[in-house]
Design a protein with these regions (language model features):
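Extreme N-terminal starter segment of soluble prokaryotic enzymes
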Residues: 1-4
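Glycine-rich N-terminal loop/short-helix segment of MobA-like nucleotidyltransferase
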Residues: 11-26
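Conserved small/polar residues in nucleotide/adenosyl-binding loops
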Residues: 157-163
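Short catalytic helix/loop segments, enriched in acidic residues and glycine
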Residues: 22-37
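Conserved anionic group-binding/transfer micro-motifs
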Residues: 32-36, 53, 100, 154-156
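Phosphate-coordination/substrate-recognition cap region in phosphate-metabolizing enzymes
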Residues: 39-147, 161
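Glycine-rich phosphate-binding "P-loop"
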Residues: 25, 142-153
Length: 166
């Protein structure tokens, strides 16, 4: 029987700082690297075989998968798909979540985070964070690069996964 394993990347340095990350390409924290290793150990303990793997373009996800595969003693190519990139948080990108909640209020904060079709405000076209996205944007159709996202477009984007072996 086939099995589907879904893993989230390990803790990133911005997760540790409680910041909205989205498409900003930040590294894993040491804790995140350990979490990835533990995921690999659990997969091994459960004797689950991996035949194919996918990850987003984000280095924290690629590093998580690489650590898992290394822990499993697997040296296999994996597929990258920008469609698996984390949700884009628009103008909230880089902000501390607790400070943002205090500033905009609990209700609006929840809408931006959990609402199906309410996206945070657009990221400004002159945002410093846009430079961080440029390497990620290679191979992504320009009309598909978001400046913010609600959960709705993210869930639809994840339904189709082209392959790009690494």
């Amino acid at each position: 029987m086939s099995k589907l394993i879904l893993t989230r990347h390990g803790q990133s340095i911005w997760n540790a700082e409680n910041r909205f990350t989205g498409w900003v390409d930040v590294d894993l924290s040491e804790k995140g690297k350990e979490e990835a290793k533990k995921s690999g150990e659990l997969i091994s303990e459960l004797n689950i075989k991996i035949d194919i793997s996918y990850t987003s373009y984000l280095k924290r996800a690629i590093e998580t998968l690489t650590i898992i595969l290394k822990t499993l003693n697997l040296s296999m190519k994996f597929n990258t798909a920008w469609e698996l990139n984390e949700r884009h948080y628009g103008s909230l990108t880089g902000l501390n979540k607790e400070e943002t909640k205090k500033k905009i209020g609990e209700e609006q904060f929840k809408k931006y985070r959990r609402s199906w079709d309410v996206a945070p405000p657009l990221m400004a076209k002159d945002s410093n964070y846009l430079e961080n996205f440029s390497p990620l944007n290679d191979g992504i159709p320009k009309n598909k690069i978001p400046f913010t996202e609600s959960l709705k477009p993210v869930s639809y984007t994840h339904l189709t996964l082209p392959t790009n072996d690494r």
